[in-house]
Amino acid sequence: MSCPIDKRRPLIAFLRRLRDLGQPPRSVTSKAHVKRAPKEVPLCPLMTDGETRNVTSLPGPTNWPLLGSLLEIFWKGGLKKQHDTLAEYHKKYGQIFRMKLGSFDSVHLGSPSLLEALYRTESAHPQRLEIKPWKAYRDHRNEAYGLMILEGQEWQRVRSAFQKKLMKPVEIMKLDKKINEVLADFMGQIDELRDERGRIQDLYSELNKWSFESICLVLYEKRFGLLQKDTEEEALTFIAAIKTMMSTFGKMMVTPVELHKRLNTKVWQAHTLAWDTIFKSVKPCIDHRLERYSQQPGADFLCDIYQQDHLSKKELYAAVTELQLAAVETTANSLMWILYNLSRNPQVQQRLLREIQSVLPDNQTPRAEDVRNMPYLKACLKESMRLTPSVPFTTRTLDKPTVLGEYTLPKGTVLTLNTQVLGSSEDNFEDADKFRPERWLEKEKKINPFAHLPFGVGKRMCIGRRLAELQLHLALCWIIQKYNIVATDSEPVEMLHLGILVPSRELPIAFCPR
C-alpha cells in the first residue's frame, strides 16, 4: 500500500514551481527602526534616513497559489493555534513579515517600535480590517454598521456619541452600584454551584451569565435572571448565538464570504442565524428603554445619545449590539484567565488579598473610588492580560502609503498587530512566561507602553475599556474577599483561538471559602 504522503509529493512539487514563478527572493529582517517616509507620512522620532523596500520584499512563510500559507497553518495546528504559529513566525522572519491565508493578505507587526511608528502616523479616522462577514450580514438584512465596521467620518460621528459616556472616568464610576448588584447575586451563584471540592462545572458559561447580566443592567436597566433559578431562555440563546457568530466569521475571513453567501453554506447559515438571534434580543431592550425615558432623556445615557447626537434607531441598534456582544464574551474571558493565573500563583493571590483587606476592612462592598487605592489589583489584571490575553491580535488598514521598518507599505495594506507576541516576548518583558504583577509597579524598570495593548491602540482603542476594567476590578474584590482560588491540578492549559483565546479544557480551579 502506498503512503498518502507519497501521493502528495508531485502536487507539492508542482505548487512550489508555481509559487516560485516571478517571485523575488525574500530576505529575513528583524530591524524595527523606521526610516524617512514620503511627504504625506508624518515623521516620527524613530525614523532615519535611507532607502526602503516595497511590500513584495517582505519575508514570510510559503505562499502557495490560491491557498497562501493555509496548508502550513493547518499542519501547525490549524486556525485554533494560529496565535502560536504567529509567534513562531516572528522568531523566524523577524518583527515584520507578510502572510497570506487564502484570500486574506496581511503584514504582521511584532515590535513596540513598529506599533509606535504606526501610532505616530495615524490619521484622524484610522481604518480597521474590513470584517466582511459582518458587513455581508448587515447588507443582507438591511441593518446599520456599528463601530467595529464603520469607517471615516461616519465612524467618528458614532464613536463621539458613545465616547462622551463610556470613556470618561467620572461617568463610568457612576455605574459601580449596578455592577455590584449583579456581583452580589453572582457570589450566591458560586455558592450554589460549587461541588464538595469547590469546583464549578462549566465555569466559563457561568462567567458569561455574570457578564451578560452586568452589561444588560448597565445598558438597559434590565435583569434576565441568569443568576437566579428562573432563567429567561432568551438570554441563554443570546450567549450561544455570540459564540456561534464568533466561531463562524473567522472561516469566512480566509475564504470569500460572497461565495459562502451565494452557495448558502452551513457556515453562512449559522452565522446569519446567530446575528438574527442577537439583533432579535437587543432591539426590544433598546426600544423599551427609549420609550421609558423619552420624556427625560438626560436621565438615561442611551436616550441621551439617541436624542442629543442624532443617531438613527438603526445606528443605535448596531452600535449597542456590538458593544454588548464584546462585553459579554471578552469580559467573562478576562475574568476566567485571571482566576486561573491567581490559582497557579498563590503568593500573588495572598498579596492581593492583603491589599483588598487593607482598603476594604470587614468585607466591605467595593466602590469605584476604592479601586484607585489598589495598585496591586490593577497590576494583577494587567499582568493577566499580558500573559493570557482574550484577543491575540488586532488590525489596521492603511489609508495612505506608510513607511514601517525598512518597508514602504501601500495604501490599503492590512496590518495585523500581534499584541500577544509583544506580551510574551523576552525582548519586552523579563521572565515573560512568569505571572509577576510586581513588574508593573517597579519604577526603576519602565515598560514600553506599546508592548502592552490589550485594548488596542490609538483612536480605535476599545470604547468599552473603562467599563470592562471596572467590572473586572470589582469582581476580583468580591471573589478574592470570599474565596481562595485553588488549582486542582498542575497540568498546563493550552489556549485555543475561537474568535478569542479560550482554554483547551475545563479550567482546573476551585473556589474554597476563606
UniProtKB/Swiss-Prot annotation:
Q: Gene Ontology terms, cellular component aspect? A: mitochondrion
Keyword Isomerase set for record: no
Q: Which reaction does it catalyse?
A: calcitriol + 2 reduced [adrenodoxin] + O2 + 2 H(+) = calcitetrol + 2 oxidized [adrenodoxin] + H2O; calcitetrol + 2 reduced [adrenodoxin] + O2 + 2 H(+) = (1S)-1,25-dihydroxy-24-oxocalciol + 2 oxidized [adrenodoxin] + 2 H2O; (1S)-1,25-dihydroxy-24-oxocalciol + 2 reduced [adrenodoxin] + O2 + 2 H(+) = (1S)-1,23,25-trihydroxy-24-oxocalciol + 2 oxidized [adrenodoxin] + H2O; (1S)-1,23-dihydroxy-24,25,26,27-tetranorcalciol + 2 reduced [adrenodoxin] + O2 + 2 H(+) = (1S)-1-hydroxy-23-oxo-24,25,26,27-tetranorcalciol + 2 oxidized [adrenodoxin] + 2 H2O
Required co-factor(s) are: heme
Q: Give the EC number(s) under which this enzyme is classified.
A: 1.14.15.16
Q: What class of enzyme is it?
A: oxidoreductase
Keywords, in A-Z order: Heme, Iron, Lipid metabolism, Metal-binding, Mitochondrion, Monooxygenase, Oxidoreductase, Transit peptide
Say which family it is in. Belongs to the cytochrome P450 family.
Write the protein's name.
1,25-dihydroxyvitamin D(3) 24-hydroxylase, mitochondrial
Q: Which organism is it from?
A: Mus musculus
> Per UniProt, what is the name of the gene that codes for the protein in this document?
Cyp24a1
